[in-house]
Amino acid sequence: MEKKRDLRLVKQRLKALEKLQVDVKYLDDIPELYEEYRRHKLPKYQFTARCVRTGALFIAYGREKSVTNAALFLLTLHEHFKRYGIRLEGSVVQTDNGTEFTAPWNSNKVTIFTKLVERCWGAHHHRIPPGAKTYQSDVESSHRWIEEELYAAETFASEQEFLQKAAQYQKWFNCSRYNRYKGNTPLNLVRETYPALPEEAVVFPPVILDNLLVQYKAELAQWAT
């Protein structure tokens, strides 16, 4: 109990969006979703970023679990935050050691994901110790909730409807869903750092990242060098 209380205090000292946990969720292993996933050729992966201080949730989808899609997720998030004056310099982006985020252990290469965190965001990429899943508890909790409250609870007649319902869920989660552990909605907690921030700042309509490659190809190349 003491350790949990200490961890809560550490999180409460953070500013909004000062630390984000980023992870990927598989969608093809959800029994209630599988038939619609197969029939409508829905994306296989959910790319997730969750703010440790506020619980704010940001998601996008990918057909591939690739470093390119992870980088596109960062670019679109950065673009969105910048639009509302949210500064990411000095923040921490935490991930596991998956190859969509990091190079293999025996490689000295730096991935485009890490380069974007450091150069575009001006942030720090923190990798958790191998196998230390509890380090990602905030984002893992959101994966459990979205599976129960969206993917297993709703029906989807098309890819378009899937994205529409995902957008509705993301808006509800950030603007209306009260988090008992954190004591408020994510939107109100973000406003403790950014007073008078419009609701739209935490509304991030999900997209399929693979479809953005042509649009962002030049920008990705710029940050990769």
Residue ranges and their predicted role:
Residues 2-13, 18, 123, 145-225:
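C-terminal domain-tail junction helix/linker
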Residues 24-46, 52-164:
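RNase H-like DDE/DDD metal-dependent nuclease/strand-transfer catalytic core used by mobile genetic elements
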